[in-house]
Design a protein with these regions (language model features):
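PRPP-associated nucleotide enzymes
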Residues: 1-134
């Protein structure tokens, strides 16, 4: 029985994705998003890969990162905006709710973002992705 398990686990998993891959780096995670994108781009063109991914989103010079941001209104309320189409994509959203270096303007003053506000922005992006902005 152990031989069957080890034989099955040693087989290569297919590397070809089912859907295009997209990565959204939220406010405060831009550097991490760039590193993930760089890794994916290097993996994509790696000569050891048996299946090339040139027909999928990310094979161009822009990579897998999707442009998204959450602008704030003067009252502090915000909205999630995604600049690219995401229909049919496998999305990964990178968010650091403890990124206190992120600020926004509220009544003309710079306010550091709390974990609650990062989480609210994450929910706004998820709502924008699903097409049901509330």
């Amino acid at each position: 029985m152990n031989e069957n398990i080890s034989n099955e686990s040693s087989q290569k998993f297919p590397m070809r994705p089912v859907a295009p891959l997209g990565v959204i780096a939220m406010n405060g995670c831009e550097e991490m998003g760039r590193r993930v994108n760089e890794y994916l781009m290097n993996w994509q063109v790696d000569s050891s890969s048996d299946q090339k991914l040139h027909s999928f989103y990310g094979s161009d010079k822009n990579g897998f990162l999707l442009e998204a941001h959450c602008p704030r209104f003067g009252t502090g309320e915000g909205k999630g905006m995604i600049k690219d189409t995401v229909r049919g994509y496998d999305l990964f959203i990178i968010c650091d709710v403890g990124a206190y270096q992120c600020t926004y303007k509220l009544y003309g003053r710079e306010i550091p973002m709390t974990p609650d506000e990062h989480y609210a922005d994450l929910k706004r992006i998820i709502a924008a992705v699903s097409g049901k902005a509330y």
